């Protein structure tokens, strides 16, 4: 299955909105985690250590399906993210053995 990277960049109220919607964001990703389709997920941080976005590397059937994952994420829906980008990627390291 193809691999995609979702990069969400927070808007000006990102920190406050993250706190409010974090549990829904994590719950939304959990089915993908349970299915073994998430390779990596976590916040992007500023030099001061504050979250300023998120990155999720995950498997999806195609770009359209990956975009649905990004567009329906609670951080996107609730305005945490000012922008969301989804691109197909290729895992080079560590070597994918699946």
Task: Place the predicted regions along the sequence by residue.
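Conserved, structured core segments of small domains
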Residues: 1-98
